[in-house]
Regions:
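PLP-dependent class I/II
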Residues: 2-187
Length: 187
């Protein structure tokens, strides 16, 4: 799944697993789409590349489960995939600024441990210091401070939460202010 391949920060570069060696290339199914990097969420345009026998089997299944995406979505995806670097560069710069800011605010909160993400638009802080699992923590956070987070249980990490920073800087500032208030209340 390479849906976030264009959304990397801090001078990092994305490397496709399929590019690691000819042997790995022959065994890799790459799945991607236009929803994240090109802000086309909901258009349902994706694609896959891999061994021809797997792609043929996928085509067979897909042809019986879904119709083609709308024509405008197909044209939009075609335009996006044929080089719109100048148009997405400001969006990626904004995401990188949000990434830095949310990480800065989050790591200033006592008890929070969080590595700075180098791609996508999520942070995944560890909340183990607060003595409750991520489901209870997330429920209380939304009930008490109206801040939404996805419990890490969904990702096999019960001591973590996932926050999205696909919003404006003002929302990040306010959300992190409320998150800090909540964490501080836990003592």
């Amino acid at each position: 799944d390479e849906i976030y391949e264009r959304m990397v920060y801090g001078g990092e570069h994305f490397v496709s697993v399929a590019s690691l060696s000819p042997k790995i290339f022959r065994k890799t199914l790459t799945v991607n789409g236009v929803s994240k990097a090109y802000a086309m969420t909901g258009w349902r345009i994706g694609y896959a590349a891999g061994p021809s026998e797997i792609i043929r089997a996928m085509e067979t299944v897909q042809s019986h489960t879904a119709s083609a995406p709308a024509t405008f979505a197909q044209y939009g995806a075609m335009h996006a995939l044929n080089g719109v670097e100048d148009e997405i560069r400001p969006m990626l710069a904004a995401f990188e600024a949000r990434n830095k800011r949310i990480h800065e605010l989050m790591t200033a909160i006592e008890g929070i441990v969080c590595r700075r993400p180098m791609g996508a638009f999520y942070v995944f802080p560890n909340i183990a210091a607060f003595g409750m699992d991520s489901r209870e923590f997330a429920q209380r956070l939304i009930d008490e401070q109206h801040v939404a987070a996805v419990p890490g249980f969904s990702f096999g990490a019960p001591d973590n939460l996932r926050f999205s920073y696909a919003c404006g800087m003002e929302e990040i500032e306010e959300g992190m202010r409320r998150f800090k208030t909540f964490c501080d209340s836990l003592g």
